[in-house]
Structures are given as C-alpha cells and as structure tokens.
C-alpha cells in the first residue's frame, strides 16, 4: 500500500542513496547492512508539505543511509486528516500535521472524539501553516473571510487538513459548509479553477511563498486578494475552537505584485511519528534535521523556521524518547507535558 503512493522525488532520493551504498568502502557497507526503511506522509503538491517532506526524506537518506542504513521515502496524501488515519493504520512512520490535527487527535477532540490517537509522538515544530483565503478581486466586499459567503469556493480536497481547518475557522466566524458553494480541489487545481473563473476563491493554507498562490498573483490580467483577519476574528477562533491560531503577517513582496503586508493568521505545523519507531532512529533523524539547516532552507523559505529555539513550540503530544534525548543534549528545558511516560 505504501509504495503505491511513493512519488518520484522520494524514489530518486532512495535510489541515489542506494547507489552511494553500493560504491562505499566495504567496511562502511557492512556498518549499514541493517536497513531501516521509513515513510513520511506529506500532502498534495502545490503547497509546502510536499516539497519540504521530500526535502527531509532526501536529507535523512543522504545523511543516514551509509552509516546507519536509514532510508526515508516521502509520499503525497490528502493532508493532515489522511496523515492521522495513516499513522493510526500504521501505513506510515512519520507525518507532517497541522497543529489543529495534532492537538485534536492526541486529545480526542472534534473528529477524534472518543477515538484519540495516543500512539503519536512529537519530534519538532516545523514552520507556520499560514492561512490564505484567496478570492478574485471583484468578489471582495469587506476584505476579510466573511467575503467568501455565497461564493463557489474550494475548501480543499475532501477529508484533507485544508478542508477541516478551513471549516473550523469558518465555524468560529458564523459560517459553515453550506455558506459557500463548495468545491473540493487540491492547491493547483484550485488556482487553475480561479484562473478559469470557474470558482470565486479558495482556501490554500501553507508556508509562504505558496506555489499555487504565486501562480495566481503572477497570472497576467488576473487580480486576486488574500483576505485578512481582524483581531476580533482571531480571538473568536481561539476562544471557540481547537485551532491554535496566532497573528501572521505576509510581508509585502512575498508574491508577485504584492505591494502591502497581508494580516492573516497561522497555526504551527508539526513533525510527528509513531511510538513504534525506535529511540535510536528518531534520535538520528532529529539530529540530522537540526545539524543541516542549510539543506531545507534551500528547499523552501519555511526551512528558516526549523530551529532549536522553535522546536518545542505548540507541540500537542509528548516527545518521542529519541527527540527528547537530542533536546536534552542541547540543554533545552523540556515542559513536563512533553516528557513521555514510561
């Protein structure tokens, strides 16, 4: 089942590492005879999860295959919702999740009421998942998310993290699924539908710059606007839902022709894993991630957020013992709630 979802870049990374193993000195080859193959779930193409997930998989495979026999493959998915399901079904070993899904799955909230996922463990906070409620400029009335009412609007793929987080935000602002004429499209599908004027807007949350949003801003003759959240709206979202939101400003110039800052909101993205992954493996994954910062920064601008200082921010579930070991070595003070129970 896993291999059906394996994408070419993850495959190429694994092939590259396997070739490197074949040509290494025999002593090193013997050291890596025991192979650990892992799968990390990302999301659809056009956002940030997929390129960053592929980047992490490639980094880990390149850094850890020779000496430790660890190889990692990145797969696409419908996003956080499917990623939680795949972790529950033990189809994947690692996953990128929105903070909303990590918190809800661990605590048994919302969709996961009466069925919490207590086998997930936190590794690190990654980067902010920034809300991009984008609409055609001629559909703008107030400039905030209430403008999506009545529009033919892409909520994201059915069952995706995009759909769930968007509906959660909408519920806090007095809207629901019936408030829009819903379409269920991936990121690039949404941008294409907006360019073709088949829909009036879309929810495309990711770390900026988001490829699908850049595509919209760069299209000649097309005028779009990313809607802004008021302080009151952010307060309502945090007070009435499990969405762990905070203010985020998309700086002017992030997108082609963007002349002003955009005041939106964000939630943390998380790297989590199954408790079944060994302590030594997770320790090595965590160590490689933080000791090679330039690698992921070259993949995407959001790689700059992956730092030791940010590592424990917004984590909903206890740390995996392997990650805990690394952070203790670095002298981090670990909150009691993040210390795994033995």
Predicted feature descriptions by range:
Residues 1-36, 341-342:
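Short, low-complexity disordered leader/linker segments with a strong preference
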Residues 32-104:
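N-terminal (or domain-start) structured segment
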Residues 37-63, 73, 129-196, 313, ...:
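Bilobed "Venus flytrap"/periplasmic-binding protein-like clamshell domains
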Residues 92-127, 207-212:
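Acidic, polar ligand-binding/catalytic clefts
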Residues 99-101, 109-111, 137-139, 176-272, ...:
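Pocket-lining segment of extracytoplasmic ligand-binding domains
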Residues 114-126, 131-132, 253-262:
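A structural signal for short loop-to-beta-strand junctions that line the ligand-binding cleft
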Residues 150-168, 241-315:
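Ligand-binding clefts/hinges and TM-proximal coupling segments of bilobed small-molecule sensing domains
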Residues 189, 206-226, 238-239, 280-342:
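An extracytoplasmic/periplasmic, membrane-proximal ligand-sensing/linker region
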């Amino acid at each position: 089942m896993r291999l059906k979802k394996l994408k070419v870049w993850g495959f190429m990374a694994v092939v590259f590492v396997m070739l490197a193993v074949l040509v290494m000195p025999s002593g090193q080859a013997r050291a890596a005879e025991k192979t650990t193959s892992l799968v990390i779930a990302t999301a659809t193409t056009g956002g940030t999860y997929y390129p960053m997930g592929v980047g992490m998989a490639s980094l880990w495979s390149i850094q850890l295959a020779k000496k430790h026999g660890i190889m990692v493959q990145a797969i696409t998915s419908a996003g956080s919702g499917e990623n939680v399901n795949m972790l529950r079904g033990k189809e994947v070993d690692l996953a990128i999740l929105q903070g909303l899904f990590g918190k809800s799955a661990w605590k048994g909230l919302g969709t996961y009421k009466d069925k919490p996922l207590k086998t997930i463990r936190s590794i690190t906070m990654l980067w902010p998942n920034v809300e991009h409620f984008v609409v055609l400029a001629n559909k703008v009335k107030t400039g905030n998310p209430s403008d999506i009412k009545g529009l033919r609007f892409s909520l994201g793929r059915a069952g995706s993290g995009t759909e769930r987080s968007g509906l959660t935000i909408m519920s806090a602002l007095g809207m629901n699924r019936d408030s829009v004429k819903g379409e269920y499209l991936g990121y690039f599908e949404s941008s294409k539908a907006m360019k073709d004027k088949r829909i009036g807007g879309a929810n495309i949350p990711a770390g900026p710059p988001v490829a699908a949003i850049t595509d919209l801003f760069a299209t000649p003759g097309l005028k779009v606007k990313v809607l802004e959240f008021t302080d009151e709206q952010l307060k309502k979202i945090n007070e009435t839902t499990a969405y762990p939101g905070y203010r985020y400003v998309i700086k002017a110039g992030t997108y082609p022709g963007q002349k002003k800052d955009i005041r939106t909101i964000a939630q943390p993205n998380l790297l989590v894993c199954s408790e079944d992954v060994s302590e030594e493996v997770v320790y090595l994954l965590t160590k490689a991630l933080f000791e090679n910062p330039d690698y992921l920064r070259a993949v995407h601008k959001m790689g700059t957020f992956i730092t030791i200082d940010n590592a424990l921010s917004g984590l909903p579930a206890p740390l995996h013992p392997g990650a805990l070991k690394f952070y203790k070595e670095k002298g981090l003070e670990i909150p009691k709630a993040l210390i795994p129970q033995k």
